[in-house]
């Protein structure tokens, strides 16, 4: 899904652009079987460059070259696809002891009239120094398709999360605020993942 083209570039490129806008320039990818195209996309391909050079598509080449100059890319493989928690834990070797952003590239977040979602989240992190998760309101009948948060409102656009429930039935959902694929996590998440037994949620 990450390589699905939207207009002139794949979803993953938009995710990297969003991270750069938020001030993040070390891109750490957790990949798996069949995801080699991700690594290839962020690498030089002299054959492809030679074909595109001088053509009407050279601007695409310039765009990816510029992106590659602005950040570093590192990759590690998830041995088995065991969910998001395991993918984040697999990335520990690349993250070390720093807070970090998570972009699930198959959630395209566009804010045409302002800052990107991750940039807004960085400001919240800088103020509160805690993990931050992005949410969006969904119709009540659709809550069983998402992770849903419970919590207490701090301000108009900010909620202190007390619980996250994966795909609850509409009658059991604490809200209609669904988690979307943007997180800022602190390194203690790795300890929490270690202490959490595997499960479908």
Feature locations, PLM:
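N-terminal glycine-rich phosphate-binding loop and ensuing alpha1 helix
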Residues: 1-58, 114-120
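Residues that recognize and position ribonucleotide moieties
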Residues: 4, 142, 182-183
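Short amphipathic alpha-helical face segments that pack within enzyme cores
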Residues: 11-14, 86, 184, 188
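Short loop/turn motifs at secondary-structure junctions
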Residues: 23-24, 96, 127, 160
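Small/polar loops that bind or transfer phosphate-bearing groups
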Residues: 30, 76, 181
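Conserved beta-loop-beta/alpha segment of the NTase-like Rossmann-fold superfamily
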Residues: 48-51, 58-151, 187, 194-197
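Catalytic-core segments of class I nucleotidyltransferases/pyrophosphorylases
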Residues: 101, 115, 122-126, 153-201
